[in-house]
Amino acid sequence: MKKNLFVTKRDGRKEKINLDKIHKVLNWASEGLDDVSVSQVELCSRIQFYNNITTINIHETIIKAAADLISQDTPDYQYMAARLAIFHLRKKAYGQFEPPKLYDHVKKMVDLEKYDENLLKNYSYKEFLQMNSFIDHWRDMNFSYAAVKQLEGKYLIQNRVNGKIYESAQFLYILISACLFSQYPKNVRMNYIHRFYNAISTFKISLPTPIMSGVRTPTRQFSSCVLIECGDSLNSINATTSSIVKYVSQRAGIGVNAGQIRALGSPIRNGEAFHTGCIPFYKHFQSAVKSCSQGGVRGGAATIFYPIWHLEVESLLVLKNNRGIEENRVRHIDYAIQINKLMYQRMLSGDQITLFSPSDVPDLYKAFFSDQKKFKKIYLQYEKNKNIRKKTIKALDLFSLMMQERTSTGRIYVQNVDHCNLHSAFNPELSPIRQSNLCLEITLPTKSLNDVHDTDGEIALCTLSAFNLGKIKSLDDFKELSILSVRALDEILDYQNYPVLAAKKSAISRRSLGIGVINFAYYLAKNKVRYSDGSAHNLTHKTFEAMQYYLLEASCELAKEKGACSLFNHTNYYLGKLPIDTYKKYIDDICNEPLHLDWNLLRSKIKKYGLRNSTLSALMPSETSSQISNATNGIEPPRGFISIKVSKDGILRQVVPEYKKLRLQYELLWDIPNNTGYLQLAGIMQKFIDQSISVNTHYDPARFLNNKIPMKQLLYDLLLSYKLGLKTLYYQNTRDGSEDDQNITSKSITEDICESGSCIL
């Protein structure tokens, strides 16, 4: 590099380039890291220097040089690049490396209207000094490079027009804690703030995008999962559409139950007109979902639910594929098919499935969710009733069409409605589960609206977080983490605003939470067990037993302190039923691990005090949160040791945790021979989880004759999922070779559907 080059400082001054300054920063960034070379980063950087380059560009150049060196053999470059990026970020935010004192920072941000003014009203100067003492800014150096770029892109308060950053990560963590516990008694709240800050800033607990980016700002809307049920009237359809727009404008993910909409050709007003069927209204929903685009961000995302016995099912199943024309396709939303035991039995016995318009059989539609015995009885009666419009189709043909479309699009999902109601947190007679959410992990009661202000309707919301299994040293750790998660998320329900009254009614009366996990693949590798061979069964059983037990215990303690949720009597917990009472007993055939905790003691406590929250657990996808925590995604096996994601900031490489130590213990997705082991582990988890799991299936055509996945295999996995008691199936991933080059996932499928980040972590 020529030493007579000049640089332009951040304040506009020019001076000769000082190589020692750069060298000093690089030495600092590499301290304590393995297999990183300062000279190698300098070598890569020098080529790109030019006269009058700005110090900002120099910094960005050396960051990119370090990031480009991230590989399986040299994973610590992800931390070197991250430290350089943190240095740069703080310079942009504060004009210096050292962050300001917390009170000074909050005062300035409130004056700029970036932070909620209630922070200064709720806490004294002395309390800010105390919170400042809790902060460990060096924890910023624990982020990977991909995590820093996610923080910059999604979480940190900024001006999205000019790119100005206003804060760094530790202020985010301490102020989320301060906001959520602001209404706790003054004699205990600082203790909770300190504990919660430590848990989230050390990645033991992961929070979703709406909370991470929104709590501490004047905007108090943190919609996670939104479930909206649509009735069979124009008023209800329009109310559904209006509700979709309100929540999509907040970048929320939407689940829509459109199963009641009558079929094509059904009479309207006693035959005065005939119905146009489902497809025009699905298009209406699609337009609503895609209507809001903020600053060039793509519109929202939704999954539509309908029963497999709907009269239009053959036309609905193909709505997402690339064949057909625009008039008979609705490709920009996803679909979930609702199935129960009788439908599976018809397929296995080689029988027919009879299709109806739900409007002709309203009692059948109701029983489909609330009473399986009654459903079968009514279904058989309607099949014999010659006065009701119907159509029969061979069950195997219908299931094959469904699985064919699931394979070709990857995004035809499955909801087993009987499992959702028989192994549920809710009493199906009072609060049946009639749909799920965008990502198929939430199972909460809903009720259709007649207008957007309808106080009788119910829109379900669920508030999410996750435990990082990689940080669990003992199963007893779940006790403290459950106390903190349950209390913090419960506070959000009262802290946030609600754009639709029916959503507030549901959230406040049911207080449903969905707490899941990240880093399961690392957890298995660390414990030297695998997805595919059954060796992880007992560990998984013990882990998820402890998780659900301590979540319920924490909610029960909170109910003792603050009272049970007002609709606690709508839950199975109210009846004394726990998840261990209602799970699919086939699980006992594949896992003989006994229960280790005192469930009868817990049952008696719940009977005495109730629960503060109707539900506690759900296992969601966790793309973004996993990157922040440098963890593997949810319960999923990694596709490769290093993931490469192409973003607006360039290529982001992230290496699985402890790659060098555990590379022989990790089981990569495409090395797993089939879905059986993964599905069995999900079934063991579902034994304890009181909502559902975003369960994916994966197929490598190269493993099959003529590179074609046999329908027999697809149906086998579908039936196995049902046999294991799984409530829902999410993506079907088919290996096409495009990701084999260093496992590139240029825009992961989860990130693509869940752009809002609301229904995922």
Curated annotation (Swiss-Prot):
Its activity is regulated as follows: Under complex allosteric control mediated by deoxynucleoside triphosphates and ATP binding to separate specificity and activation sites on the alpha subunit. The type of nucleotide bound at the specificity site determines substrate preference. It seems probable that ATP makes the enzyme reduce CDP and UDP, dGTP favors ADP reduction and dTTP favors GDP reduction. Stimulated by ATP and inhibited by dATP binding to the activity site.
Disulfide bond residue pairs: C225-C462
Please tell me where GDP binds in this chain. Answer: T209, N437, E441, E623, T624, S625
Q: Where is the active site?
A: N437 (proton acceptor), C439 (cysteine radical intermediate), E441 (proton acceptor)
Q: Which reaction does it catalyse?
A: a 2'-deoxyribonucleoside 5'-diphosphate + [thioredoxin]-disulfide + H2O = a ribonucleoside 5'-diphosphate + [thioredoxin]-dithiol
Record PROSITE patterns: ATP_CONE, RIBORED_LARGE
Domain (ATP-cone) spans 5-95
> Which residues are tagged with the site Interacts with thioredoxin/glutaredoxin?
C754, C759
The organism's place on the tree of life at top rank: Bacteria
Positions of the record's site feature: Important for electron transfer: Y730, Y731
Q: Which Gene Ontology terms of cellular component type are present? A: ribonucleoside-diphosphate reductase complex
**Keyword annotations for this protein?**
Allosteric enzyme, ATP-binding, Deoxyribonucleotide synthesis, Disulfide bond, Nucleotide-binding, Oxidoreductase
Q: Where is this site: Important for hydrogen atom transfer?
A: C225, C462
What is an annotated GO biological process for this record, any one?
deoxyribonucleotide biosynthetic process
Q: Give a yes or no for keyword Oxidoreductase in this entry.
A: yes
Q: Show the InterPro entries listed in the entry.
A: ATP-cone_dom, NrdE_NrdA_C, RNR_lg_C, RNR_lsu_N, RNR_R1-su_N, Rrm1
Q: Where does dTTP bind?
A: D232, S233, L234, R262, R269
UniProt record similarity statement: Belongs to the ribonucleoside diphosphate reductase large chain family.
Sum up the protein's function in the record's words. Answer: Provides the precursors necessary for DNA synthesis. Catalyzes the biosynthesis of deoxyribonucleotides from the corresponding ribonucleotides.
Quaternary organization: Tetramer of two alpha and two beta subunits.
The name on file for this protein is: Ribonucleoside-diphosphate reductase subunit alpha
Name the source organism.
Buchnera aphidicola subsp. Acyrthosiphon pisum (strain APS) (Acyrthosiphon pisum symbiotic bacterium)
